[in-house]
């Protein structure tokens, strides 16, 4: 039997535009794409001092999720894990994902790790191994693969199968994020 109580979702990382977006979708019952069943209730802002896309946005997104959606702000990933049923790790700086996950793995909370899961295959492997060790359901992907326009195009292709496409997306190289890994996921989602 399902509970009428929403799943308490904790969020780690308020330096990504996904933080207020996901919070809105889960907490705002009047939103056109509201997702019932869960609610973001607690979050740790995080942030990376050497990554402009992180430190320049963390304060504004923190204020937004706290003031607009009433989400409790805490001082550590561990406090998030203690106070929730499931976790969204949306830190924009993927360099911190492994360390953040190490800090909360023992809590055994199901987790979504926003793209990219890691910046190296060794970090990704370590995250997967930790999840397996602690029996944690974990997933990581870019949500654009589920964008309405893309899924509709795949369903309505006149020839039955798509044989080619041009993809583009944001491509600002970041000194702390190697190569195209951070942003190439968006264009690659269509494949």
What are these model-predicted stretches?
Residues 16, 117-118:
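Short, glycine/acidic-enriched loop or turn micro-motifs at the edges of active sites
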Residues 16-20, 98, 147, 184-191:
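A structural signal for well-ordered alpha-helical segments within the folded catalytic domains
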Residues 23, 62-63, 101-102, 124, ...:
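Short amphipathic alpha-helical segments and helix-helix/interface helices
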Residues 75, 113, 138-140:
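Hydrophobic residues in well-ordered beta-strands that form the structural core
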Residues 108-110, 115-116:
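Short helix/strand-capping hinge loops at secondary-structure junctions
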Residues 170-191:
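Rossmann-like dinucleotide-binding domain that binds NAD(P)(H)
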């Amino acid at each position: 039997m399902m509970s009428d109580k929403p799943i308490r979702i904790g969020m780690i990382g308020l330096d990504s535009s996904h933080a207020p977006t996901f919070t809105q979708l889960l907490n705002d019952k009047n939103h056109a794409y509201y997702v019932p069943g869960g609610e973001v209730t607690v979050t740790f802002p995080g942030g990376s001092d050497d990554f402009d896309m992180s430190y320049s946005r963390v304060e504004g997104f923190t204020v937004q999720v706290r003031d607009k959606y009433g989400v409790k702000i805490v001082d550590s990933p561990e406090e998030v894990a203690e106070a929730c049923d499931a976790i969204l790790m949306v830190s924009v700086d993927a360099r911190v994902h492994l360390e953040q996950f190490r800090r909360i793995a023992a809590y055994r909370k199901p987790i979504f790790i926003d793209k990219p899961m890691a910046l190296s295959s060794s970090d990704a492997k370590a995250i997967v191994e930790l999840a397996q060790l602690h029996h944690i359901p974990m997933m990581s992907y870019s949500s654009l693969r589920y964008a309405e326009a893309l899924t509709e195009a795949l369903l309505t292709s006149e020839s039955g199968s798509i044989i080619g496409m041009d993809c583009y997306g944001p491509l600002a190289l970041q000194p702390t994020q190697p190569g195209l890994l951070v942003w190439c996921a968006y264009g690659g989602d269509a494949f």
